[in-house]
């Protein structure tokens, strides 16, 4: 992900729906000054793709909600979204 192309990632807490990475629906979240976290957007309850709505990832099936960093906010999901490794190289974040 070229950081210079996405203003939403210029601030800590910014989140970008990246699309599919290795067939996994993926988001990228800025978690610190120079740190980013990839998230697998498949709900840990029934594997449907969660969508970012008003700063919260929501599953369309049963209403599970997750924070921007993937922690469970509202069930029925019992586990947070799975993390995807990231590596920052210059102004690019490599996912996976």
Q: PLM ranges: what are they?
A:
Residues 65, 69:
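Extracellular/periplasmic metallocenter environments
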Residues 1-54, 82-96:
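N-terminal pre-ligand scaffold of iron-sulfur
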